[in-house]
Amino acid sequence: KMKKINIEPIIQSVVDDYNSIYKVKKYIKINYENDGKKEYFINGIENRIEQMIANLLDNSISFTEKGGKIIVNISITSNRKITVKIIDEGQGFKEKDTSKIFRRFYSNRPDKFGEHSGLGLNIVKNLVELHDGKIVASNRPNNKGAIMEISFPSM
């Protein structure tokens, strides 16, 4: 059931969990940043927010080389949207039209990543939309990685 939740501690907790695993496993550091506020309220479902962030971090981690860095950034825009960005140092997207990566069963992974369903980003997109949000994928300007940006209406 949807209710007013502060997503800051939820996202911070997912980042902490992932840091404790992947700092050791792949020497990947996930930096959590915010714009100095303590509260980012949305109408949402706590475990669905966890699921979204975990899924996006899983993707970022699988495309980031050993020793790489991932940034999770949360901020409030001038038009009162809460924005969550996950910025990695992976290979970015080959697709000119990045919206297609959110399609069901779509996959752009090299074979070395093994089997996967192609459902992860589609599920994330559905969860974001359930929260009246939007998700956009883009490449970092220097072509060194990807940016996943989610925006939610704030409460």
What are these regions (language model features)?
Residues 3-19:
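A conserved beta-strand-to-alpha-helix junction within the catalytic ATP-binding
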Residues 120, 124:
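Short alpha-helical Gxxx[C/S/T] motif in the catalytic ATP-binding
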Residues 1-3, 39-44:
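Conserved micro-motifs of the catalytic ATP-binding
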Residues 21-33:
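Short conserved segments within the C-terminal catalytic ATPase subdomain
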